[in-house]
Amino acid sequence: GLSVLLGATQLVKNPLITLDVYSSCEVYGKQFFDQNDHEYTELYEQARKLPNVNYIGYKPNSFIKSNMHKYNMYAYPSIFEETSCISLLECMAGGLYSITTNLGALFETGAEFPMYIPFDNDLRRLSMKFAAAIEASANILHEETIHKHLETQSNYVNAYYNWNKIGTSWTRFLTGAISAKTK
C-alpha cells in the first residue's frame, strides 16, 4: 500500500498537501524487522526523497495517537484483504477524514464513514484514484457537513469499538463456548 500512497502523493498538485509516513517493519517486532525490512529499503528511500513527504518511520502507537490532532486526513490504500484495521479505527475515532480501499473487511470496519476507493489490481491506476480522492477531500475538509460527519464518525467508533466493549464481548463469547463444551 505504501507504494500506492507514494505514487498518489507524486500526482497530487496541491502544494499544501503533505504526507507523513509512519511505516516500518519494526512495528511487527525485532525478528520480523531483521528478516524483512531490507525488502522495503527502496520504498523508504523514495519516501525520504519526495518533496511533499516526511518519512518518519516507526513510532509507538502512543506517540501517533497523541499527535493525531495535528492531522486532517488518513489515507490507507490497502492492497491486502484485511479482516479489520486498528489504525483505521483509531484515526476515525480521532476525527480524521479517512480514505481507504474497499478491499477485504475494510468496509465492515469503517462502516459508512470513510471514502472508499474501489480496489484495482493495476496499482498505478489505484494511485491515480487515490491522488484524485486526496485532492477532492482536501477541498471539502473545511465544510460544516464534513465536521459533523467526522464528529458522528468519532462518536460511532468510540461507542462500538472501544477495548472495554470488545473485551466484554469476547469474555461472554468464550465463557459461553467453554460452558457449552463442558456440558
Predicted regions and their residues:
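Short hydrophobic beta-strand element within catalytic cores of glycosyltransferases
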Residues: 97-100
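Short alpha-helical segment that forms part of, or immediately flanks, the ligand-binding pocket
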Residues: 65, 88-93, 104-108
